[in-house]
Amino acid sequence: MKAVLYMVIPCYNEEEVLPVTSGLFLEELQLLIEKEKISEESRILFVNDGSKDRTWEIIEELARENPHFIGICQSRNRGHQNAVLAGLMEAKDVSDITISIDCDGQDDIATMEAMVDAYYDGAEVVYGVRSSRDTDTFFKRFTAQAFYKVLMRMGVETVYNHADYRLISARVLKEFAGFKEVKIGRASCRERV
């Protein structure tokens, strides 16, 4: 049986890039469906994180035009990681796997197929790892390196240069949702499409 994939894409003031990257995400989703890697029930879930521009209106238009696009609109800006978390929690009961990816198109969308293949080979979590940080500013590269060094000195095992680009199985998400140490819940949504 083919897995239902939900791409979880946090959006904050993305009206400039969303019309372009949404098409790229849809092309990859359709390619994976055509190759019979994933179910036709798979979706692209945009999480509007309180954008001040037309991001939500664009998501609504996309959802009206194509059933593979859906969206949730948070009541206010809650931050990037909370938007990702809201999308993952929204998808956990209706998908077999999720892939979180940023809306800006900087991650290699074509590697989704390899991530899905790794899932079929038994992986529950697949990290996207940056091969280069050339497009990052000096400040971002410096702070990222400092962050990893601090974590290593504290004895924390981490995946160096990993991104928010990752596949997570529904089984892992359901376990994660059960943790009570952190308030994990559904998004404070104003609207859904």
Descriptions of predicted regions:
Residues E14-V17, S51, D108:
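Donor nucleotide-sugar binding loop of glycosyltransferases
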Residues E28-S39, N66, A91-D96:
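Alpha-helix termini
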Residues E14-K35:
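Short, well-formed alpha-helical segments that are part of the catalytic scaffolds
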Residues S42-L45, W56-L85, M89-E90:
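Conserved donor nucleotide-binding strand/loop of the catalytic core
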Residues Q74-R76, H80-E90, I97-S100, I109-I184, ...:
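Acceptor/aglycone-binding surface of glycosyltransferases and processive sugar-polymer synthases
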Residues L45-W56, G105-Q106:
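A conserved acidic beta->alpha catalytic loop
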Residues A3-I9, L18, F25, S42-V47, ...:
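Hydrophobic targeting segments
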